[in-house]
């Protein structure tokens, strides 16, 4: 499905994020990833990206590193508000709250784009019911 870019933020020389519109029927679990690509005249190049936004948010958000010679990231880092992005129709993944055992504490350690699924999870108020 095609979504429109609503916001782009360059955090530093190596990391940026972007938000897109979200089809009201698009469902995912916090911590899931989906395929992202850019429209073109040929078959689009798609890559897996963790969803940074929580499943209750009205937009989709993604983190990406900047790779100058990357087949997709070299183009994604030049996104502007209003550009179109292809988003896979399905999401998947195992780093989801349903797979986390309840306990006293929840530790989530990551850097860079590895933060994306964790940010999706910590924005979910229900995750805090599983931990003290």
What do the PLM-derived regions correspond to, one by one?
Residues 1-81:
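Ferredoxin-reductase
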Residues 71-132:
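FNR/FR-type flavoprotein reductase catalytic core
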């Amino acid at each position: 499905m095609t979504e429109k870019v609503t916001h782009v933020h360059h955090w530093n020389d190596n990391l940026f994020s972007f938000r897109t519109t979200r089809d009201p029927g698009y469902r995912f679990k916090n911590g899931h990833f989906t395929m992202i690509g850019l429209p073109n005249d040929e078959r689009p190049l798609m890559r897996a990206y963790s969803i940074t936004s929580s499943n209750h948010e009205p937009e989709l958000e993604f983190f990406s590193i900047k790779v100058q010679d990357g087949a997709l990231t070299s183009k994604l880092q030049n996104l502007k508000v209003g550009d179109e992005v292809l988003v896979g129709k399905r999401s998947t993944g195992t780093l989801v709250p349903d797979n986390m055992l309840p306990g006293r504490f929840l530790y989530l350690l990551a850097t860079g784009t590895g933060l994306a699924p964790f940010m999706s999870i910590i924005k979910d108020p229900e995750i805090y019911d599983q931990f003290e």
